[in-house]
Amino acid sequence: MNYKPVKAVMLRNNDKFIDVDSVITVTNFKMNFREDIVTFTATKEDGSASQRWTEMNRIINKVIS
């Protein structure tokens, strides 16, 4: 699995990134410029989903292949 570091603000729907607990698929991506955060629904490989948020400038490891 290849990945590259990108800022969280560069994520889009259906992108995948590596988190501490598994590979996460992003859906329902929204940017909140007032609070400088992004919110999204994170779906793990086992099918469980949760609402998450992170700072726009946070570096994440986006899966590219």
Spans of features found by a protein language model:
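Mixed-charge, Lys/Arg-rich low-complexity intrinsically disordered regions
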Residues: M1-R12
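Intrinsically disordered, low-complexity, charged/polar segments
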Residues: G47-S65
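Short coil-to-beta-strand transition motifs
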Residues: K16-T25
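Basic/aromatic-rich interaction segments and small domains that mediate binding to polyanionic partners
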Residues: T27-W53
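Short, functionally important structural connectors and interaction interfaces within domains
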Residues: M1-Y3, D21, D46, R52
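Residue-level marker for the onset of beta-strands and adjacent loop->beta junctions
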Residues: R12-N14, V38
